[in-house]
């Protein structure tokens, strides 16, 4: 990893991409401290400390929620818009065709939907936090809603700029940056926990550290793991030359969906609990908040189910066994022991299904079990399995892209 970073810094084009990404991180961090007008941030901070879900939301926003800055809603409206658009491309035939032919149009629709969802959520936030409003007039609420919507649109733009001109997936990196920025406060909490609980507290934190280390090792292993399906290409004689005859393989990753299922599931589950937390005096809202308590059994069960669902869903739309089998057949290849065409597609689909199930269950376990364990240990820490999966997964994906960029650069240099 360090050798890759060293090589990337030496190469001028990749160095520029890294510096641009870091510059966007700086803009993001500055934005988390630009306050929204007409809001008492002390009350917001108290609510975030009292409600676990709001505390978790504050973590992924990089502290922007507690500060109630222009980035307080984070990038979640964009994630929700992406989920809706991806589901619609499966349901609506016209959108499915558009997704294959014109991805830019789908991206444009996603941006429009993001702004709409952000404005609706901003209105809900403005009315939900009435106790924190310095001025509750219509003009003040409209100003707050428009400021929050503009902040989300700005974050979306920053994410797209990172994807286009920087290194890695911009949206994932914004969430990554938000979580990483809260690590110092998390470490300080653990220090206070040890001071308050003495030897028992130290043992609890040590156990937490060992589990976290084991989880990181497991996440890296699963992220890099793959099943290789052998493919043989028949020999062809053209004139006096013999073509083909070589062996290769189809790499099927254990976790082909990456951290996308975790981010999607988290974004969906945060919505009802967050809305409920806006109405602390409502009995119905309190019931909803308790049901969607991040340390509760129901929440974590639903979280695991959604992770499994989105893992299968995302794998299905990014990897088509029929297309793979057709490409193998066109190029004169075959999987040993199988006829080209439909039998090959069915075999690849079967292997993909088994591997995806294992990867999905692993993601669900890493996301859910640490949260339940911290609930049992009474650790009020938001750096659970979800944060770990996002940080490690995004870091690995970014390093892969950096390596690919360096490899492409070396090929271009060779061609010149």
Predicted regions located by residue number:
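N-terminal cationic and glycine-rich segments that engage phosphates or anionic surfaces
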Residues: 1-96, 101-416
């Amino acid at each position: 990893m360090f050798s890759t970073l060293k090589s990337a810094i030496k190469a001028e084009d990749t160095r520029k991409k890294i510096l641009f990404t870091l510059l966007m991180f700086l803009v993001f961090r500055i934005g988390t401290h630009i306050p929204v007008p007409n809001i008492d941030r002390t009350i917001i901070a108290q609510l975030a400390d009292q409600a676990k879900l709001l505390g978790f939301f504050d973590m992924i926003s990089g502290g922007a929620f507690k500060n109630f800055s222009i980035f307080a809603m984070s990038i979640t409206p964009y994630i929700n818009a992406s989920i809706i658009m991806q589901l619609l491309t499966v349901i609506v035939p016209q959108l499915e065709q558009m997704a294959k032919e014109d991805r830019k149009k789908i991206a444009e629709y996603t941006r429009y939907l993001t702004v709409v969802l952000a404005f609706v959520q901003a209105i809900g936030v403005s009315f939900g936090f009435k106790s924190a409003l310095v001025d509750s007039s219509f003009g003040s609420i409209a100003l707050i809603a428009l400021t929050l919507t503009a902040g989300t649109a700005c974050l979306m733009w920053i994410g797209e700029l990172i994807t286009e001109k920087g290194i890695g997936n911009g949206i994932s990196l914004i969430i990554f940056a938000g979580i990483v920025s809260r690590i110092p406060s998390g470490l300080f909490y653990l220090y206070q926990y040890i001071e308050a609980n003495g030897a028992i507290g130290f043992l609890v934190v040590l156990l937490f550290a060992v589990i976290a280390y084991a989880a990181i090792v497991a996440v890296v292993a699963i992220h890099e793991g793959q099943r290789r399906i052998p493919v043989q290409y028949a020999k062809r004689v053209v004139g006096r030359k013999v073509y083909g005859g070589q062996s290769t393989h189809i790499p099927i990753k254990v976790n082909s969906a990456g951290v996308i299922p975790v981010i999607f599931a988290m974004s969906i589950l945060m919505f009802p609990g967050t809305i409920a937390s806006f109405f602390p005096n409502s009995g119905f809202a309190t019931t909803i908040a308790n049901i969607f308590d991040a340390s509760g059994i129901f929440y974590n069960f639903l979280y695991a189910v959604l992770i499994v669902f989105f893992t299968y869903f995302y794998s299905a739309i990014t990897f088509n066994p029929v297309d793979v089998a057709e490409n193998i057949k066109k190029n004169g290849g075959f999987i040993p022991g199988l006829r080209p065409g439909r039998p090959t597609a069915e075999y690849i689909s079967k292997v993909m299904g088994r591997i995806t199930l294992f990867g999905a269950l692993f993601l669900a376990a890493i996301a859910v079990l640490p949260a339940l364990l911290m609930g049992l240990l009474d650790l009020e820490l938001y750096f659970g399995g979800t944060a770990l999966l996002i940080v490690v997964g995004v870091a690995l994906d970014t390093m892969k892209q950096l390596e690919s960029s360096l490899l492409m650069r070396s090929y271009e240099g060779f061609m010149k």
